[in-house]
Amino acid sequence: MKGMSHEPKSPSIGMLSTATRTTATVNPLTPSPLNGALVPTGSPATSSTLSAQAAPSSSFAAALRKLAKQAEEPRGSSLSSESSPVSSPATNHSSPASTPKRVPMGPIIVPPGGHSVPSTPPVVTIAPTKTVNGVWRSESRQDSGSRGSSSGRERLLVEPPLAQEKAAGPAIPSHLLSTPYPFGLSPGSVVQDSRFQPLNLQRPVHHVVPPSTVTEDYLRSFRPYHTAEDLRMSSLPPLGLDPATAAAYYHPSYLAPHPFPHPAFRMDDSYCLSALRSPFYPIPTPGSLPPLHPSAMHLHLSGVRYPPELSHSSLAALHSERMSSLSAERLQMDEELRREREREREREREADREREKEREREQREKEREKELEREREKERERELERQREQRAREKELLAAKALEPTTFLPVAELHGLRGHSTEERPKPSEQLTPTRAEKLKDVGLQAPKPVQHPLHPVPAPHHTVPSLISSHGIFSLPGSSATTALLIQRTNEEEKWLARQRRLRQEKEDRQSQVSEFRQQVLEQHLDLGRPLVPTEAEHRPESTRPGTNRHEQGSREPPQHFGGPPPLISPKPQQHTVPTALWNPVSLMDNALETRRAESHSLHSHPTAFEPSRQAAVPLVKVERVYCSEKAEEPRKREATPLDKYQPPPPPPPPREAGSLEPQTFPHGPGPFLTELEKSTQTILGQQRPSLSQATSFGELSGPLKPGSPYCHPTARGPDPAYIYDEFLQQRRKLVSKLDLEERRRREAQEKGYYYDLDDSYDESDEEEVRAHLRCVAEQPPLKLDTSSEKLEFLQLFGLTTQQQKEELVAQKRRKRRRMLRERSPSPPAVQCKRQTPSPRLALSTRYSPDEMNNSPNFEEKRKFLTFFNLTHISAEKRKDKERLVEMLRAMKQRALSAADSVTNSSRDSPPVSLSEPATQPAPLETDQPVGVPASLSDVPKTTETGRLEQLRPQELLRVQEPAPPSGEKARLSEAPGGKKSLSMLHYLRGAAPKDIPVPLSHSINGKSKPWEPFVAEEFAHQFHESVLQSTQKALQKHKGNSALLSAEQSHKVDTAIHYNIPELQSSSRVPLPQHNGQQEPPMGRKGPPMQEADQDSEEDSEEDSEEEAEEAPRRQWQGIEAIFEAYQEHIEEQNLERQVLQTQCRRLEAQNYSLSLTAEQLSHSMAELRSQKQKMVSERERLQAELDHLRKCLALPTMHWPRGYFKGYPR
């Protein structure tokens, strides 16, 4: 134990090295408790050397033995109790008893030899040889544990060969042994390496196992509490604990926590141990019963009958008392047989292990050579890549610098790690015992990149597993006994030395290959930064963390190692990483081993504890190697101590971090330019390894750990954002982009730019323009002829689509419903007649922005350009004012002229006959356009008529100006019902003028002759019609009068009206000139007209002309365009307002209701309070009255009382 690093005396259950050596140094889980417990357990504790001296050591030793046994066993009988006595807990336990063969366990245990052991640190190194496993059962184990130091000595002496054999196998610390699977792995989960005796976790040493650590294995191995019959030998043999063993395991004091009161557990029944369950039972409180190996226990269990060899006479007596001699003998015989079998098995296993180790070593060397060749090739590739990358990097260096601080730290750490791993890796391999190390290396070789990885990982494991490593390294843990420890140590060290030599050689090669590999990987990673594999690798890595994670190669060989007991020993920390349970995918590891490894290193640095999934990969890599390195741990540890110290202030990283955590601490120093490290790495082996490691880490971290998936990802991880990965070459984080991402981005760009994007690679830029041009062409073409075929409509109906016409009808229906609901006056049918022809939107157009606000909006110019698409123009403030003035004039005129307008219009108008419906629409002409039109029409109309009319109008110049235009406009509108509707909306806008306009159109008689009846009918009809039609729109229009939107709408309307007028005006013979009206400068015509009109209208005309010109420039009619949009919008707004009103009224009603209800509630609560207070008053009053009553009663009752007394007194008299 001394040799082993006790540093972490904490039980390094997880620390068993996977090294072929089953030998593991284990610190007793609860050394002092063990000692105390053992001693308390009874003098036997002291008597059993191990118990006393190795109390901690013993439980620990027991655990170690167990582990060793298991490690050995795994091959033969991973956990089969029979195959390896160790494997069956009972057997293991009994092994101490049975071990007696080798040495009288009892006596030996009892002898103070055990005491000598105590001197050794609690940690016990158990070198499980195959025999050792047997020894567990066999004396070697027992002496180490149960037998006690003397037995241990004897065993050491007697079993030195065993010890040595075991030495080959990992010596398993008792605590490890105690935990069936120190890693908390279920026995099944741990695939035991045939090389290593499986740690027979099943047969965990109870003492070794913290009382609470009862694993399934224990339970499984231990029979449930059986009746004495059940517990009989039949079960015992599997249990592997004969009474003696049981006694060894369960000292009475051990049993004290829960003596086997249960009949099943009676020591009487050899099977009370029933797989010696109790030892594992948490029964012994950790303090009370330090887990002790049965051998360590060597306390007599009162209930257990020790085999004669094992037990003192007293023990024997105790046992015999409780156990039938028959069962004890049976147990003993079984144990003996088992032990014999175990010993043989262990020997075979040891031989196998040795053979395997040799094989592995050779394999590793071969692999390493292959790896080196591969690395050299990769190096060449990497050089090319690097040059390429450097160019890119130079470009991105600036960006990288920004990111560097974050990423580089981890990188530097990684470098540090790498350096360590380089130094230590060779040792780790050696430590690992060539077998394991070689295996690792072989695996590494198998996986080109992985080889280096193990090297990197090893250092980390060293840091992480210092104590374990020390224990491993010292496999000669004094725990077993000085001799055994020495033998084991010698064996281990010889193996280590060989392994080290081998490793040093390999490591040099590996370092070089790693440097090249690292470079290549950097390049690859750079190329594959987006590779999703990395995260997977990270996940896989965690599993491989134990051994495989070190490299892909490791990954390939790792699973076995992982399953082998030792890696799991270290694995417990890996358990930190969640992933360890998952099976890592060697394939993925191989591909992304570097990346993963990098990720792991990073993870380690960044988030040792968090590492978990990502760290699994990173840490495990390092960890695994380290674990393997544990055999050479001493050296590596020493070496590491320095490097670790350099890199990681806390050489013993928190267990959670394990190797990984080690790394983070280890490499606090800034990553430093990763590239620089890389360059240095070429120069220095350490440098090389470190860069590869750091790169691996950075890459891995970036690709793997950075990935969000990796829990390990630490904030520190370079890629806090999983989307970002560290680009080694660029030395900066760059966004991780997958092909899918690129595809999506391209598609989105194509969408935005309006070209078609196909995933087809044949698609190239040249096509883009064509496609765009085609799309533009399609978009700009006039719309196709309306196709209302039933097929198409049915198809569209599937999507809830229909034709505009049907939509209009539906909208009209809705409007009717709304009107009915709101009792609005029904608008004139023509409004709905043509699709959206009503220019109502014009009036409806409203906005909460003031024109000035809109004029000052940032994208004002863009908006103006947009309007030009629709032949609309922006109206400047002056124009708007003019228009507003015009509108006001029109309104005034309308009001003034309403009366005169009829006659004026009748007499002055020679307009084409207008159908009644047309007149209805005509009012719109009044719009500003009409004013323009008015001058034109006035000038055009025969001067006589005009003059007369003008004169009439002069008094009302405004009227007159407007009127002439209205007539023409009206006529035009009348002729064009649709146009009329549009104008109508305008008219509504200029509603004031509309009334007189209406009369005019109505009054127009055919050929300009006014038919007396027509004016009346037409006027009345039109008037009413317009009134109703315009009523709703008027309000909106008036609201919007000031708005530029309205003005623009007006303009467009004017244009429309002008166009409309053209026909009617042309129709009216008197107004031949009106055709000029065609939305062309009507104002000019107006100017020709009477000067008065001209003057009045000049300003109006100017503004109107401008707006008209702008509005009329394009054939607005073709696409209802903005007007239709405005109209739809208007409808939408109106509906919204309606809805809002309904809801508001509802809301108000509800509020009122709520208020009244709340008032009522308040009143009620008040009345309730009053009632309550009254009730209280009543109660108190009642109580008061009652009290008075009682008082009165008492007063009245006293005499009553006396009466009877007196009565009685007197009665006898």
Swiss-Prot record:
Compositional bias (Polar residues): 15-33, 681-700, 847-858, 1065-1081
Residue numbers bearing the Phosphothreonine modification: T433, T905
Coiled-coil residue spans: 319-402, 1093-1197
Acidic residues: compositionally biased ranges: 1095-1112
A GO BP entry: gene expression
Transmembrane intervals: none
Region (Disordered), start-end ranges: 1-154, 326-384, 527-579, 630-719, 816-858, 898-979, 1065-1118
PTM-bearing positions, type Asymmetric dimethylarginine: R305
Biased composition (Pro residues): 648-657
InterPro entries noted in UniProt: GSE-like (IPR022207), GSE1 (IPR042337)
Signal peptide: none
Compositionally biased tracts (Low complexity): 51-63, 76-89, 103-114
N6-acetyllysine: residues bearing it: K496, K739
Record-listed Phosphoserine modification sites: S10, S84, S95, S766, S826, S828, S857, S907, S1099
A Pfam family of this chain: DUF3736
Keyword annotations: Acetylation, Coiled coil, Methylation, Phosphoprotein
Skewed-composition ranges (Basic and acidic residues): 331-384, 537-560, 630-643
Assembly and binders: May be a component of a BHC histone deacetylase complex that contains HDAC1, HDAC2, HMG20B/BRAF35, KDM1A, RCOR1/CoREST, PHF21A/BHC80, ZMYM2, ZNF217, ZMYM3, GSE1 and GTF2I.
Name this polypeptide is given: Genetic suppressor element 1
